[in-house]
Amino acid sequence: GADDNTPDMPQGDIPLDFGVSVDQAVSRAAETTASSLSSMGVYAYYTGNNNLSTSDKPNFMCNQKVERTNSASPWTYSPVKYWPNNPADKVSFYAYGPYAPKGLNVSGTTQSGPPTMEYTIQGAEADQADLVIAGALPNQTYASNNGKVSFKMFHALTRVDINVTNVDKATGMTITVFTMGSLLDGKR
């Protein structure tokens, strides 16, 4: 997490609590669902009574590992962070899951603005993650969500399987290029 000894960080009496939902995937290997997600990385920005801006840094939590043992157990993390005592003070959140899969590089405490992620697909299918992300939950207060930060995760990747059939039974053929166009809206 971020530096826990920073003097301007809130030390309230009510701990931050987390919840997660995951949108339904259409086609993924080792699909991440709300019940199968057991860990996530959380970024939190404490901004006092100011709204989140692009110049803010993750000074409250930075890639904090938040985990649970099963879908019925609570989310836990250490050290525990608390909601500010001042009801006007705000904390903004981002999250991704699962926490730190192979091939994922995430930004640190020195980067301003939203966290950035770079993911390299692993060669072995067993090492590939179904990465889910939650966009910003800006300017949260204890009163705005009754103390529970609820992330709505979305699948960041798409799995594409290509099957080629040689109907002529010809030999010596090689596929040298395969191209997919940009399908931003999911339609052709």
Model regions and ranges:
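Sec-type signal peptide cleavage vicinity
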Residues: 1-188
